A protein has these predicted regions:
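Short, conserved active-site entrance elements at the starts or edges of catalytic domains
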Residues: 184-244
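Aromatic (often tryptophan-rich) hydrophobic motifs at membrane interfaces
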Residues: 233-326
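Amide-forming acyltransferase catalytic core, primarily the GNAT-like/NAT-type
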Residues: 2-57
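A residue-level signal for conserved active-site and pocket-lining positions in enzyme catalytic cores
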Residues: 22, 167, 309
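Conserved active-site alpha-helix within GNAT-family acetyltransferase domains
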Residues: 112-133, 162, 300-317
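Short catalytic-loop micro-motif centered on adjacent basic/acidic residues
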Residues: 103-104, 175-177, 292-296
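Acyltransferase donor/substrate-recognition loop-hinge adjacent to the catalytic core
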Residues: 125-208
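Conserved donor-binding loop and adjoining core beta-sheet/short helix segment
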Residues: 37-116, 240-269
């Protein structure tokens, strides 16, 4: 699918060539949510499903799913332009969609909503927004101080230290390397397939079917990551044990002092590997990139993932909102 015209608004394909355009708008924002980067959106979008337009001097990112348009981010631009852009984006979505029920804007940062509330100049448009739209808190991003993840001090990190020590004792010949998209591609895809197989073994059939649908998207994301690894300025580590790749992690810098983890996988059978590679990645980010905080994204609503992310004692939780129409 090429470009799309909806309600006289041309929507262009969201491709790798969109990177400098989107990043021009992102660079003017002060936001530490993991969703507000080009790479985080590009690698997860299925082929041909992403579109963008510059509306009211704002970058507007849309996704087409099952014929319905939604927005992956709010309009990116100056505060004075964002409200009108949002209203126009809903008009575009409504013109395309089978029902206004499907029109929504995901991953809205709290600061954008607070700006609407606090600005006297926007009082009229804020009233209009409250009259016509619903704002719902969805997920939170988990943000950690990097020094805490490296040092793992105190009783709250006792289990993490124990797991890492057991790993180092069991696998003293481990090898850590910076991720190379050519050298490590085959090993990472093999590990990913094993990871999927190990997970499915212990799942009820119905749950496994839903899980495998999501895995198709994640496999596509990893392939996109390899295809444009250097171009996307991604940062990664891999770990080898006895010549086999047993773990990898990939992230990127999202601001001067904050980095994010996009994808991480380790072999379930290698106990302590996940904790170890997370600490080593934290070390690399601090030593080579001067990073002070790591954002590991949200828990996607999964309780087990929430427990794991809370167990690392986040420095802060950053809320994300979805805007619907009434």
């Amino acid at each position: 699918m090429g470009s799309l015209t909806v309600n006289k608004q041309k929507l262009k394909r969201f491709t790798i060539t969109t990177k400098p355009i989107m990043e021009k708008y992102l660079s003017k924002l002060d936001v530490d949510l993991s969703d507000y980067t080009f790479a985080a959106n590009y690698i997860w979008l299925a082929n041909s499903s992403g579109f963008y337009a510059i509306i009211n001097k704002c970058f507007c990112l849309f996704i087409m799913t099952g014929g319905e348009l939604t927005m992956l981010l709010p309009p990116l631009g100056k505060k004075k332009n964002a409200t009108d852009a949002m209203i126009k984006c809903f008009e575009v979505m409504n013109a395309n969609n089978s029902s206004p029920y499907y029109s929504r804007i995901d991953y809205v940062q709290a600061a954008m909503i607070e700006d609407f509330v606090q600005s006297a100049d926007e009082a009229e448009s804020m009233f209009q927004m409250l009259e016509n739209y619903l704002v719902e808190k969805k997920l939170v991003d988990y943000v950690y101080e990097i020094n805490a993840l490296i040092e793992l001090r105190g009783n709250s990190y006792h289990t993490k230290r124990t797991e890492i020590n057991k790993f180092m004792k069991s696998y003293p010949d481990y090898v850590i390397e910076q991720l190379d998209s050519v050298k490590h591609k085959e090993g990472i895809m093999h590990l990913f397939d094993k990871w999927v197989s190990d997970r499915v073994k212990y799942m009820p059939k119905e749950e496994a079917e839903v899980f495998l649908e999501g895995i198709h998207q994640e496999r596509h994301a990893i392939k996109q990551m390899f295809k444009h690894y250097d171009e996307l300025s991604l940062i990664g580590l891999v770990i080898y044990i006895n010549g086999e790749l047993k773990g990898f992690t990939v992230g990127e810098r999202i601001s001067q002092d904050t980095a994010t983890v996009i994808i991480e996988k380790t072999d379930f059978e290698v106990l302590g590997c996940a904790q170890f590679i997370f600490r080593e990645f934290s070390k690399m980010l601090k030593e080579h990139y001067g990073v002070e905080y790591i954002n590991v994204g949200d828990d996607m609503g999964f309780e087990n993932l929430r427990k794991v992310k809370m167990s690392y004692r986040p420095f802060k939780l950053v809320p994300k909102y979805t805007i619907y129409q009434k």
